[in-house]
């Protein structure tokens, strides 16, 4: 008889997290034949050598999904668990869309899967959903693959009557993601590239500062690499504009029990998985966050190198 997941988990510092008795995606009483048909990849699109999109069949998760939440997946029974923000969801079709950048062993292993392949575990929706309400004029700034998780948030903000100004940023035009999708749900779209190959030749913070200086901005969402979110928050702080960021941290269980995703917000310890992933960008200790993200780089490189040798790849494109 399978043991039930814990209802209440308590990390070392006394934080208490309430989690569902059976999180969506937790397998109970399924046969091998049933499991082989679960979490099937229905579609796959490659945007570059390293960035790809997968549409996963997960009806129980899709029906409960809200903007800002994430999933944790595992490719096979021996694989690691990785968190990925939900880029889109279709409740009627029962699908979840994820956008992935292949940077380590697991994301490159996932990159080799295509239509018809299945995942061993796909758990969610996790995290606190975005607070979607009409506030006025909202800037949604997405950097790199951060455009994907900001898309459902921007869409929801537009649906409730906000004016949405979107900034889509990337290092170059080949790395721009979902520019067309963001244009469809935005009142104004600004495109920037670091090398000037498309849109404005500048960093995302330049138009962000200009918009804040002009006034009338009620809320800013910034999602992307940690450094990008750090400087977006620094840019908006002098203008007193509320700025929300979605943190991507090391994570194992997704219930607050392991403590791997802890971060400092306003001088207090928070857990990205149960307290976030969204936080006040002006309160986040980004230096600590970035340092924690780098702490396992040697081990990650060792794991990736071993995997590439195993699959016959000697050099990452």
Question: How would you name each of these model-derived features?
Answer:
Residues 34-117:
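Ferredoxin-reductase
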Residues 79-86, 126-133, 273:
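Short, Lys/Arg- and Gly-enriched loop/turn segments at beta-strand edges
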Residues 149, 226, 249-278:
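Local cysteine-cluster metal-coordination motifs and their immediate loop/turn environment
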Residues 73, 121-122, 263:
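A generic structural signal for residues embedded in beta-strands
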Residues 271-275, 279-317:
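Short Fe-S-cluster ligation motifs
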Residues 76, 124-125, 266:
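Short, surface-exposed secondary-structure boundary micro-motifs
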Residues 105-252:
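FNR/FR-type flavoprotein reductase catalytic core
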């Amino acid at each position: 008889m399978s043991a039930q997941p814990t209802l209440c988990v308590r990390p070392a510092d006394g934080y208490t997290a309430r989690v569902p008795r059976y999180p969506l995606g937790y397998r109970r009483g399924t046969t091998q034949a049933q499991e082989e048909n679960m979490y099937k990849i229905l579609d796959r699109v490659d945007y570059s050598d390293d960035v790809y999109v997968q549409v996963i069949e997960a009806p129980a998760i899709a029906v409960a999904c809200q903007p800002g939440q994430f999933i944790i997946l595992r490719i096979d029974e021996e694989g690691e668990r990785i968190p990925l923000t939900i880029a889109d969801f279709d409740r009627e079709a029962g699908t979840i869309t994820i956008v992935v950048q292949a940077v380590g062993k697991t994301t490159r292993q996932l990159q080799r899967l295509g239509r018809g392949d299945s995942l061993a575990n796909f758990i969610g929706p996790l995290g606190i959903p975005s607070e979607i309400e009409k506030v006025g004029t909202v800037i949604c700034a997405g950097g790199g693959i951060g455009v994907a998780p900001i898309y459902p948030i921007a869409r929801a903000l537009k649906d409730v009557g906000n004016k949405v100004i979107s900034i889509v940023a990337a290092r170059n035009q080949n790395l721009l993601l979902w520019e067309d999708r963001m244009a469809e749900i935005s009142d104004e779209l600004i495109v920037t590239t670091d090398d000037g190959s498309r849109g404005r030749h500048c960093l995302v913070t330049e138009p962000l500062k200009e918009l804040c200086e002009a006034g009338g901005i009620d809320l800013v969402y910034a999602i992307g690499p940690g450094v990008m979110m750090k400087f977006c928050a620094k840019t908006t702080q002098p203008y007193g504009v509320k700025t929300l960021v979605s943190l991507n941290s090391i994570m194992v269980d997704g219930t607050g029990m392991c403590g791997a995703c802890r971060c400092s917000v306003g001088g207090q310890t928070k857990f990205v998985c149960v307290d976030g992933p969204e936080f006040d960008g002006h309160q986040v200790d980004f230096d600590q966050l970035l340092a924690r993200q780098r702490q396992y780089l040697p081990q990650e490189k060792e794991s990736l190198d071993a995997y590439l040798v195993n699959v016959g790849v000697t050099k990452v494109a």
